[in-house]
Amino acid sequence: MDTMQFIACVLQNACRIRGYKLGHDGSDGYSDCIGLIIGALALGGVPWPGINGTNYTARYLVDGLRQNADLKMGDLVFKARSPGEKGYDLPPRYADSADQLDYYHVGVVLQADPVRIVHCTAGGVRLDEKRGDWQYSAWLRLIKNQQTYAATVTAENGSTVNLRQGPGLQYEILRQVPIGSAVEVLGETDADWACVAYQGMEGYMMRRFLAPRLSQEDERYEQIILLRQQLDAIQQAVLAAQKALEELVKTE
């Protein structure tokens, strides 16, 4: 399974999850945080090789676990607590582990810039658009790190993005590529630059101007997740308003 297939399966699994239950993987409509990933892999025919748990995953199933590093599409991200921190609850099986952090929550990076992280929490499936407490990131060994993918050129300002001869601002501009253009990412040079192909020409473009292109089906899945999240927020606001109204009526 490559990166884009993994993302597609994560979104597909997220859309069938209706609620949170510990130890579930989405196949029956319920999931916990790691179950979102386990169920996604199952949809792609990849079996889970160990314990259903975020601490197990962070210790045995990922490469390059790092803190506050640049995110990549397809990364797993973790929230963690240190010994003595409120809520710290590292399972006893890891008492002898060199790493004593409690990795208590996990999500998947759908997009690195701007950030979009999908995860399953007590309130259901959520899409985070800020990094927040997602301090740790790593690559799941079960996924082939896909360097080549289709992307759309994007920027908040201006009408074009520069395609350069090399990976740096000092290199000559080969083309000014219009925002919204489709390009093929051939490889990521470093945290800032990627090699891309545009209309038969190869060059380098800053990664922050490249948004991976999801299939129409994947975009629909993502929209379903967002709409459900918005609906949940509205329902919670209505319940809070009803409670406040009841309290006011009691005081009359």
Task: Please describe what each predicted stretch is.
Residues 1-49, 72, 80-105, 118-120, ...:
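N-terminal capping segments
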Residues 27-32, 168-171, 232:
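Soluble non-cytosolic domains of exported or imported proteins
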Residues 58-67, 167-172:
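Short alpha-helix capping/helix-loop boundary micro-motifs
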Residues 73-75, 180:
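Loop/turn positions that initiate beta-strands
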Residues 78-79, 185:
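A generic structural signal for residues embedded in beta-strands
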Residues 144-162, 175-179, 187-189, 211-222:
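SH3-family beta-barrel domains
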Residues 176-208:
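SH3/SH3-like beta-barrel superfamily modules
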Residues 220-252:
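Short, low-complexity, charged amphipathic interaction modules
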